[in-house]
Amino acid sequence: MTKKPYFRLSIISCLLISCYVKAETQSIKDTKEAISSEVDTQSTEDSELETISVTAEKVRDRKDNEVTGLGKIIKTSESISREQVLNIRDLTRYDPGISVVEQGRGASSGYSIRGMDRNRVALLVDGLPQTQSYVVQSPLVARSGYSGTGAINEIEYENVKAVEISKGGSSSEYGNGALAGSVTFQSKSAADILEGDKSWGIQTKNAYSSKNKGFTHSLAVAGKQGGFEGLAIYTQRNSIETQVHKDALKGVQSYNRLIAKPENQSAYFVMEDECPKGYDECIPSAKPPAILSTKKETVSVSDYTGANRIKPNPMKYESQSWFLRGGYHFSEQHYIGGIFEFTQQKFDIRDMTFPAYLSPTEKGDLANRPFYPKQDYGAYQHIEDGRGVKYASGLYFDEHHRKQRVGIEYIYENKNKAGIIDKAVLSANQQNIILDSYMRHTHCSLYPNPSKNCRPTLDKPYSYYRSDRNVYKEKHNMLQLNLEKKIQQNWLTHQIVFNLGFDDFTSALQHKDYLTRRVIATADSISDKTGKTRRNGLREYPYLYPKPKPYFAGEDHCNYQGSSSNYRDCKVRLIKGKNYYFAARNNMALGKYVDLGLGIRYDVSRTKANESTISVGKFKNFSWNTGIVIKPTEWLDLSYRLSTGFRNPSFAEMYGWRYGGKNDEVYVGKFKPETSRNQEFGLALKGDFGNIEISHFSNAYRNLIAFAEELSKNGTGKGNYGYHNAQNAKLVGVNITAQLDFNGLWKRIPYGWYATFAYNRVKVKDQKINAGLASVSSYLFDAIQPSRYIIGLGYDHISNTWGVNATFTQSKAKSQNELLGKRALGNNSRDVKSTRKLTRAWHILDVSGYYMANKNIMLRLGIYNLFNYRYVTWEAVRQTAQGAVNQHQNVGNYTRYAASGRNYTLTLEMKF
């Protein structure tokens, strides 16, 4: 298959483009200066300056949707660049209480907020839901891993204008899935690249991160002419796995592996094809039999494979993104345009915790024959599953994600604010996302060099190959209408917003390529001729073996007929549905002392499936929020927020749990939506010194879906294992943020000095299991990030040409109480623990700075973990917990989860 070439943007090409534009810009600038100089020399009289009107696009604010802003964090494209955000893990690096859920195979599974994660935190781009985290049920025996997916598609941050992170139930704003919060992205337009009244603009970004040897190259081009405008952004990224602290790589590691060797015992033999003159002539050169034995080997930490591996699994990451947006302004009020987005990411990993060798604990095949060709002792020695001792094993996971979006939009904006509507936005989008999770286990290249691309062939007896693949597709056809109106009535101001939407969605999971293939080669000894001395395996009377005839064996394990209710089921799991919603919001300013906000949303969702064992139905959800801000003085705000959230069962939960047997034995879930209630109190101090905000929050969750069975009247389980609305929980916590301007505190301190502070703590207050259920575990709050505070101190020169910043992060240890739970077994219960490993407290210091060489070129440098501190984050170790998406099991050494040592990120930005 010929690989299609695609355009690669390099640092050199970006620099060449930028230099050309710089030259053109300088030429125009010189011409303008010459004309200006001539005019100045001709004019000696005073002139009256002309009035200049300056307009700027509104910057996203955390109080846009909800008057209190409690639990809200806004990040703009400028702050994303300033914080050198290159991937999903960088986005919330300095935001305590929000963490990334590791998928376990390089990708991610969304965010964790206030004790909940994955599908309980909504993820949207321009109002479009992104893919759910679809975790596939594992096979009953998954000793070598399986294709479990569970990832989400990742967002390209160079296409993003702003990000809003909302902590606490937010379904009145963002609908299904915003049970514990939401992360929403707003895409860029041409206006975000064009500066002032310029008709064209170019931006380039080239970055390098040492922690994963990652390169980022991005080019954005925008222009406008007449009523037309357009934007094109191309971004390419490539990297490897995040490096562990270098101290962890010192030393060597040892292991024992199976080998084949000759043994002086009574099974001597000769090979027929090695005896051209007959059996009798070969007796003097009879060979001792081959047997399986053990050999100890010592290798570097980087080369070691097995459960005790320290270095992270090697990964190759590639990403490409095209983003196009443009349209035509028919007038100052009317605009129509289109959007096209194509992104793809590839996470290719070799799981080196899986031994490249055959372990002595493997069970040998009793059918092993002692013969071998020439001196190749391991040619036919193998273990029970058919893997030969002379080959190396490699376990590979490929996560390939692809997203394509096509949309049109119409915008009406009445800038003089006269009329019924100030602004209306009508958009229609089609979004297709494909997540391809492919597992391959190869055992067909000579030890110690495994190969991803080798396959069993007849010339490699007891070579072996196994694969498994899950392709998840999610499609949304979405229509959205947003209406805005501002009404000013003396001392009362209304900011009214109406939202209507329709989403036609499809979820399809295809299990495929679930197969095993091996080469078998065996032979029985040739019996002696009548009247001759019997061949008994002694040196004087060795066995005579013919050359084995190899043949292929194996099977396709997939059942495509839909008659299997276990992991072998490869029929497409198809769920279709429609969602309608209406939302309204009114943010009011009652004079200068009170702000009041009210918001409601009503969702109706219907689903259907291609088989009766999938749970479908109709859900009606009403969500709301209210907030009030009382401002008794100019320097004090008292805030209160009350909001709700909901989550309908995920597509994976609707499909249910399959454990074999007939389809009529599969439990079909009967679900209620999960719901949440978020309550927050806030106190804010503000003034020339900056602002300080302290808030206390309480989050109550009801009807959380978990794996369980129903309880019968006699106190035993009914055996209908599956997903049920099983649990309720309540969490409380404190959040503190501060931004201080030292010049505002004391005028003697030079302008530009500032400090920041952030702290978050979450505590489990109550949890219980719903009555009538058995075999259910209480919710393990391993999703809670340990308490963390972040202190920043920085300086920006008054000219904004350079600045420096230092950020100190302190994390507490993971609490054992959050990892302990109860497993209810009828009237009895037992303790369960999420994982054996807890993380200790840790702290690091990061420093960063920027320098503008001129108005077009900026250089940024960040040095992270400046003092090379050795630590492990809970987010990394959580991959070993019970609730992990693809749980790392039988971990022998947790050092592999250690964070990077001192590392740096260098970014060159150019704007013209």
Curated annotation (Swiss-Prot):
Membrane-protein topology: Multi-pass membrane protein
UniProt keyword Membrane present: yes
Main location (coarse class): membrane
Domain TBDR plug: 63-188
Cysteine-cysteine disulfides: none
TBDR beta-barrel domain mapped to chain residues: 199-912
Protein keywords: Cell outer membrane, Membrane, Receptor, Signal, TonB box, Transmembrane, Transmembrane beta strand, Transport, Virulence
Signal sequence region: 1-23
GO process annotations (BP): siderophore transmembrane transport
Molecular function in Gene Ontology: ferric iron transmembrane transporter activity; siderophore uptake transmembrane transporter activity
Motif TonB box location, chain numbering: 50-57
Localization, UniProt: Cell outer membrane
GO cellular component: cell outer membrane
Chain location of the short sequence motif TonB C-terminal box per the record: 895-912
UniProt KW Manganese keyword: no
One Pfam family in the UniProt entry: TonB_dep_Rec_b-barrel
Function: Haemophilus acquires iron by extracting it from serum transferrin (TF) in its human host. Acts as a transferrin receptor and is required for transferrin utilization.
Similarity-based family: Belongs to the TonB-dependent receptor family.
NCBIfam families in the record: TonB-hemlactrns, TonB-tbp-lbp
Protein name, as recorded: Transferrin-binding protein A
Natural source organism: Haemophilus influenzae (strain ATCC 51907 / DSM 11121 / KW20 / Rd)
